[in-house]
Each structure stands twice: as structure tokens, then as C-alpha cells.
Amino acid sequence: MDHDNDKKRLHEDSDNSEIKKHKPLDVLSEDGPLTQKDVVYFKKEAIWRQMRSYKQKCTLLTRDLNDIKSNYESNERKINVLDSWYESIINLFGVKKESNVELNETILIQLTNVPIGDLDALLEKRRAQLLTILSPIIENSKLSNIDKSDVLEKIEVLNAEVATLKSENNTLSKLKSQFESKVEDLQAQLLTLVKDNDRRSSKTLQRIDESLTNGSDVKEEASETVKSEVNKDTTVKNENSVDNEEFERISSEIEELKSDNRLLKESMNQINTNYDKVVKENLQLSDKLENLNENDLINSVSYQELAAHNKQLNESVNNLQKINDTTVNKLNELENKQTNVKHLLDKELREENETLKQQLQKSENDLVRIRTARDELLSKQTILKADFENQTTNDELNKLNKVLNERINALESERHETGDNSKISELSKDELIQRINMLNSEIKEIEQAFQETRENSLSKLMSVTDQENMVKKLTIEKTKADQKYFASMRLKDSLSSENKILKTQINKSQELVSKLNDLEKSYLDKIEILTKSNNDFKIIRQSALQENSKLQESLRAIDVRKASLEKELSGMKDKYSDKVQENTSFTQELNEKNLMMGKLEHKLKSTESLLKKYKTNNTSSILQEDERQLEALRSIAKCSVCSKNWKDTAITVCGHVFCSGCTQERLAARLRRCPTCNKGFSANDLLSIHL
């Protein structure tokens, strides 16, 4: 339906474009009563002012939105750069997950939001990678010999910094909220000032104000013209009216004189009665001042107030003294408790420190012993490896020796089998001798080689047996060393578990220390508050004593003043006669003024009676003009449909203004057309205004 209406509007605008170009602008009338065109002009200008205020709000919102967008874009660029840096760091270090390494989850902050999207998944991945890199580095960089005093000092410094930062944060948040509220107030004031400026510069409002002021002027001018016309008519019609006016004037003067006489008599009677009262009161006061008693002083209001104030001050001083004594006792008790707690904590910390140092020394000694045993075992292992290699070479030599012996035996058997006596007999004696010598030399060489090989084999066998014995001994020592190693590892595990327990105890003790530090700070704050209150009480006591002394001095001054007043009384009696004379002069002046007032009142009554006469003759035309102007103003401000409610909703399609109730009723009844021009509108075309 709204889409069809928009189409109709576009069609109508396109058809009537040429007519709108030649259509003259609306003009506000400058004088005379307000017309219907002036009312329409007034409505349009009100809508224009409201649209300008909406535009200003929109510009402010767009400016804020642009600032937020620029901040968002800069933050997104920074996040992308930081992500690339972290990715390059992770790639440089290389992420390799190890099963033995425990991730320290307290290093990096976890994500707080529950729904995990793409960005949250990426951040979780980066966090896991950084934890795998940082946790082993932090574990390796932890020192075993940590000084507790340094740790406690650092904790105290950090706690102090945290407290200061919290206080600064609270103050800054309060300042921020105050500045935000001030900025909102200033924006609202600026908008109201802009609206007021628009209303001041609007022609229609100036025209209405002029019409309202001109209405009163018109009434006065009309009354004056009526008077002049009446006078003219009376002079033309009847010349005897002058005599009537003179008669009325004389009668009014006589009445004025009578009223003046009556006022003079009343004022004289009042003056006489007042004079008698004043004389009596003066005599009574003089008698009282001459004969002042203690009862009069006690019954005096100032004396009672001073006495009550003195009592209150004494009671407050006593109460403050009691409170001071109780606070001093509490302070002493708190100081004693604080010293006892400090001594206990120092004792416990020293004992725990000594036990930890002893356990650490034991573990270091055991570690040195285990390392020496390990080094010995490694050296023996290298020796055994070398001996094992020598044994393999000996086995190979023995195999070679066996092969050579077998070869010699085979050659000898062949020699015996192939040796023919016929050949030997064929040889000569010299050849036989040479051959025998050669054989003897060969036999000697063979025997020598055999002996050498035999000695080598025997020495090798001896060394092998020695090595086997050594291996057996070393295996026994190795088993012993393994047992010692396993025992030391068990001891190491127990020490590591004890170390963890001690670490947890140290953490608990540190938490207790931090809690005790907080308690100490709170106690110190309380002590400071109590000392301040004690000082305040002392100051109050001193001030009370000073006030008491001042009151005593004031009482003495009152006694002195009493004597001086008695002296002044005689002087006052002398002055009384002067005052009586002044009183008579004042009474005369007052009587004269009363006479003047009576005359003026009588003139006012006479003028009012004349005005009533003139108003009864010619006031119908003025009243009709006033009614017309009032109806015009009502038509501007009241709804033309129901004529009950004020106009507060404008239809932006045609510019007509009605009340919100009538527009909503028409929308609910699906009568979506303007009652005056019959143009279609929707709920989006309504605009709330303030006339």
C-alpha cells in the first residue's frame, strides 16, 4: 500500500513539475488578523524547524559513526600486523608438541566469549602455538635458588602499583562518567539553544506575538476612540452635558473632602491610643531596667541558650574523652597483635627457608655423586668396547693360524706322498747337502715363526682371559651402578615430588603473606583513620574549652554590659523626649500621605465608574474582534479533527498538522488519507513536532 502511494506521489510530482516551478512561494501577512494561509505557513515552519533539529542530531550521529569506523579500521590494521608478527615468530621457533612438556595456561589470557567463530578459532590456535613455545622456555629459565625477600618486595611493589592503578582507574572512570554526562547536557543545551534561536528568528512566531500585543493596543485605542466619539456626540446632541460634568466633579470633590476628614479622625484616634501604649511600655521597661533580678537574667532567652550550649559542650567533651580512651586502647591492642603476627610469620618463614636449603643441599650432593658414577661407568663402557674389538681381531688371527697349520700339514703330507727316493739318489752329494741346508734353514724359519705365533697366541689367550675377567667384573660393577642409578632416580623422583610440595607450600605461604600484607594495610588505614579522628576529637575538645572560656568571658561582659545599660538608661530617657518630637513629625507626614492616598483612591473609583459607563455603551465590536483572534489562535494550536487535543504530529506528505490520537485512530481504521487535502500517508510519514 505504501509502495503504491509512493508511486502515486512520484507520478503526481512528475505531472505537476512545471506547475510547481511557476507556483509563487507562501508569504506571511504583515498586519491585520491571522488568516488560514498564515496558519498553514506556521505549520510548515514548525515542521521545518523540527526537521532541522533532526538534521543536526543526524550530523552529530554520523560524525560519531565516522570516528568509530576510523578507529575500527585502524584497530583492524594493527591486529592484522600483530597476527603476521606472531605467525612469523611461530614459524621461526618451529612448533613441535612434546608429550612431556606441560603447557603453562596462566601465561596467556584465554578467550572469554562463549560463541567461537573464525576469529576466535584463529586466536585459540595462535595461543596454543605460543604456549608450546613459551612454556618450556619459562620452565628452563626458572631458578632454583630464589630469594624470598626479593619476591616479597616485588609482590609488595606490585600490590602497591595495583592499588594505585585501581584508584586511578576509579577516579578516571568517575571523571569519564562526569564528562560524558556534561557532554550530553551540553549537547542537549546546544540543541535547545538552536531550537530557541530558530523560534526567535521565525517570522510566524513574531507575527503571532505582534498580533497578541496589538490586540491589547487595539483595545486601548478602541476605548479611547469610543470616549472621543461619545464626547463628540454629547457635545453635538446636548450642550447641558457640561453642567452635568461640573456637578459630578463638585460632588466628587465633596466626597473626597468627607473621606479625608474621616481618615484624619481615624488616624488621630490611632495616634492617641498608640501614644498611650508607648508611654506605658516605656515606664514598665524603665522600671525593669532599673530593678533587674537574677530571675530575669535566668528567664532571658540569650542566657538560657548560652547555658544549654555550655552543657552540650561539656557533655560532648566527656564523650569525646571516653571515645579517645577506647580508641587508644584499641590501637595498643592492634599494635600488639600486629607485632605478634609479624614474629610468627618471620619464624615460620625462617624455618621453612632453612629446611628448603637443607633439602636442596642434599639433592645437590646426590646429583654430584650420581654424575661421578655415571662418568665412571661411561669410561668403563668405552674400555669394554675397545676390548671387544680386540677380541674379534684375535679370533680372526686364530682362524688364520688354524688355516696355516692345516695348509702346512697338507703340504707335508703331499711332500711325503710325492717324495721319491729315486730322485734323491739321482742327486749328487753336494746338491743333497745344499738341499739339506736349505731345508734346515726353512725348518728353522718355520720353527721360529711357529714359536712366534705360539707366543703371540698364548699372549693373546692370556689377554683374552684377562679381558673376560675384566668384563665379568665390569658387568658386576655395571649392575651395581645400575642399581645405584635406579635408586638415585627414585630418590630424584621423591625429591622432585617433595620439591613440588614445597613449591605449593611456598605459593600458599606467599598467598598468606599477601593476605597478611592486605590485612596490615587495612589495619594501618584503620589506625590512620583512628589517629585522624583522635586528632579531630582533640581539636574539638580544645575548641570546646575555648568556647567555654569565651562563654565565661561573655557572661562577665554581660555583667559589665548590665552596668553600662543602667548608665545608658538615663541617657535614653533624655533621648526619649527627642524621639517623641520626631514621632509627632512622622505622624504628621503619615497623615498627609494618608490624605493623599484617600484622594487618589476616590479619583480611581470615579474613573472606574466612568470606564464602566463607556464600556457598557461600545464594547461589542472589540469583543467580537477578540473572539475572532482567539479562534484563529485556537485553530493554530488545536487539532482541526477533534478540536480537543493540541497539535503534535505532522504529515510530511502534505504538511498538515493534527494530534497524535487522531492520526493513530485513522491508521487503525485504515483511513490513510489527510482530512484536509485527502492525500494518502503511512505511519512512516508522521513526524512529531512541538508548536
From Swiss-Prot:
Compartment annotation: Nucleus
Stored SMART domains: RING
Zn-finger region bounds: RING-type: 639-678
Record keyword Metal-binding present: yes
Metabolic or biological pathway, per its Swiss-Prot or TrEMBL entry: Protein modification; protein ubiquitination
Pfam families per UniProt: BRE1, zf-C3HC4_2
PROSITE patterns referenced in this protein's UniProt entry, alphabetically: ZF_RING_2
Protein name listed in UniProt: E3 ubiquitin-protein ligase BRE1
